[in-house]
Amino acid sequence: VLREPLESGKIMISRVSAQTEYPANFQLSAAMNPCPCGYLGDKRCVCSLDQIRRYRNKISGPLMDRIDLHVQVSAIDNHNLLNQSTAPKGESNDQIQKRVCAARDRQLKRQGKINNQLTSKEIRQLCPLDEQLRDLMNKAIDRFGLSARGFYRVLKVARSLADLEASEYPKS
C-alpha cells in the first residue's frame, strides 16, 4: 500500500463505480527493533536466526528499497544514560534548522525542486562521480545488493548531504 505513494506522490482509490486519485506526497519515518525481542547483539537476545529472518521479512524488499536511509542505533548503557555530561554536544536545533533551510534553498535555486524529486538523469548530472566515489559506489552495490532504484536514492542522499555542507559536489 505504501509503495505507490512513496514512488509517485499519489494514491489511487478504486471502487466499483469510480477511481479517484489523491495527492500523497509525504516523508516516511519508520523504526523497528532489530529482532523480535529487541536485543539483537546483546546476551539478552533469545531469538533464533530463523525468527530474525521471518521478522525482517515482514517488510517487503520493494518497500525497503524505497526507504532512503537505514540507520542502526545502538543501545545506550545505563552509565551514559544517567550521566548526561558525557554525552557529545551537537548542533542546536536553530543551527540545524538554518542549515536545512539553506540546503533546501540551494536545491530550489539550482534545479527548481528538491533533490528527492529529481529524475535519474537529473541526479546523474548534478551528482557526478569521480573515481573515488565510483569505487565507493561499486563497493556499496556489491555489499548491499543495491538495485538501480537504490543506487539513485544513494546519489540523492549524497547530493543532499553535500547541500547541507554547502559543498558543490558530494565527497567520499
Sequence positions of predicted segments:
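Basic, amphipathic alpha-helical bundle interface domains used for macromolecular binding and assembly
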Residues: L2-S172
